[in-house]
């Protein structure tokens, strides 16, 4: 009986101090959103609700994700004139909404 209790105690200690038991993530894992393809046609400004810039170095392309009023997300090239104009327009709308 003493042997099995000692063995159980030893196994619990080994499990507690094993490298997997002590492993801690270096940072919180945050999902990364990347755009691999961009739309090649203009989206009318009145259909757009918001945008997010994608500048993560882990993504293959710099991009802008537009969210439409219907909830669809579309990737666009920030170098395109219509994309920059749309971003500026949305910025002005949000600026006017602030008190």
Curated annotation (Swiss-Prot):
It holds the Pfam family IL8. One of its GO terms (molecular function) is phospholipase activator activity. It is found in: Secreted. The keyword Iron does not apply. GO terms for cellular component: extracellular space. CDD domains: Chemokine_CC. The keyword Cell cycle does not apply. Highest expression found in the small intestine and peripheral blood cells. Intermediate levels seen in the heart, placenta, lung, skeletal muscle, thymus, colon, ovary, spinal cord and pancreas. Low levels seen in the brain, liver, spleen and prostate. Induction: By IFNG/IFN-gamma, mitogens and IL1/interleukin-1. InterPro entries: Chemokine_b/g/d (IPR039809), Chemokine_CC_CS (IPR000827), Chemokine_IL8-like_dom (IPR001811), Interleukin_8-like_sf (IPR036048). GO terms for biological process: antimicrobial humoral immune response mediated by antimicrobial peptide; calcium ion transport; cell-cell signaling; chemokine-mediated signaling pathway; chemotaxis; eosinophil chemotaxis; exocytosis; inflammatory response. N-terminal processed form MCP-2(6-76) is produced by proteolytic cleavage after secretion from peripheral blood monocytes. Disulfide bonds join 34-59, 35-75. Its main location: secreted. It comes from the Eukaryota. Monomer or homodimer; in equilibrium. Belongs to the intercrine beta (chemokine CC) family. This is C-C motif chemokine 8. The gene is CCL8.
């Amino acid at each position: 009986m003493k042997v099995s209790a000692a063995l159980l105690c030893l196994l619990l200690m080994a499990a507690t101090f094993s490298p997997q038991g002590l492993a801690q993530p270096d940072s919180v894992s945050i999902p990364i959103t990347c755009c691999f393809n961009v739309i090649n046609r203009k989206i009318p400004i009145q259909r757009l609700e918001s945008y997010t810039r994608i500048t993560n170095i882990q993504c293959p392309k710099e991009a802008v994700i537009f969210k439409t009023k219907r909830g669809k997300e579309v990737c666009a090239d920030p170098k395109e004139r219509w994309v920059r104009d749309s971003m500026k327009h949305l910025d002005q709308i949000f600026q006017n909404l602030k008190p």
